[in-house]
Amino acid sequence: MVLLLAAACGIEPSGPDGATAGRLVSQPRAVTATPESPGLHEVDVGSSRPALLYVPSTYRPDAPSPVMVLLHGAGGDARGGIDPLLAFADEAGVILIAPSSRRTTWDVIGGRFGPDVMGIDRALEHVFARFSVDETRLGIGGFSDGASYALSVGLTNGDLFTHVVAFSPGFSAEGEAVGRPRIFISHGVDDRVLPIDRTSRRLQPRLRDAGYDVVYEEFADGHVVPADKARRALDWFLR
C-alpha cells in the first residue's frame, strides 16, 4: 500500500484481492432497472445503515448525468456525507450517492481496506443499473475521515473515478494507484481537528510530485465545509 501521511495513523498493508486491496468492481453499463424519481431516497447496500441517493430534478434518461459519491466524516452517516453538495445538485444536474461506513468511521482509518469498499461498490452498482452516467464526470469526495477515504479509494480506482474531492483530509492511503484522477483539496487554516500544517499542506505537494493534477485551496475557518468551497468543488468537477 502506498502511504501519503499515513504512517502516523497506523495504516498497514492490505491483502492483495478484492475489497482488502481497495479495488471496486462496478462499472457504468447499460441501464437495466427502473430509476428512482427525482428526490432523496434510501438505498439498501447490504449493511445496517442504508446509503442515500439524490436524483436531481433535471435528470433525463437520454442525457448521461455526472455522478458523485460522497463520504461522511467520523461518527457521521450518509446524510452528513450528502449534505455539503445537496443544495447545488438540482442546478448542477448531478446524481449524488452517499453510503455510510459500517462502523463509526471508514475501515482504512483503522489500518486496512475492508467491507466499506464493498458498500461503495454496491452503492455504485445501484446507480449504474438505473441511470445513464457521464463517464467523464464520475467522482468521489468526502469530508474529514471521508475525505481521507475518498482520496484512498479514488486513487486506487483512478481508472473508474475521474475526479476526487477532499474537504479537510488527514491523509491518503491508497493501494496500488491506478490512473490519474484530478484532485480538489480544500482545508481551513484554523482547523484544530486535522491541523492543516500536518495534513493538507504536506499532502497536496506530495500528490503533485506523484503526477496528479491538484487544485488546492485554503480558507479562513476551522474543520468545516463552507458552502462556497462546496460550490467551488462542484463547479470544478463539472467543467
Regions found by a protein language model. Name each.
Residues 79-86, 123, 167-176, 197, ...:
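Alpha-helical scaffolding within the catalytic cores
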Residues 9-67, 112, 145, 153, ...:
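A domain-start/cap signature at the N-terminus of enzymes
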Residues 34-58, 62-132:
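Serine-hydrolase catalytic machinery in alpha/beta-hydrolase-like enzymes
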Residues 66, 94, 162, 181-182:
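Alpha/beta-hydrolase fold active-site loops
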Residues 184-186, 192-239:
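C-terminal catalytic histidine-bearing segment of alpha/beta-hydrolase fold enzymes
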Residues 81, 128-130, 136-180:
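Primarily recognizes the serine-hydrolase "nucleophile elbow" in alpha/beta-hydrolase
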Residues 1-7:
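Sec-dependent bacterial lipoprotein signal peptides
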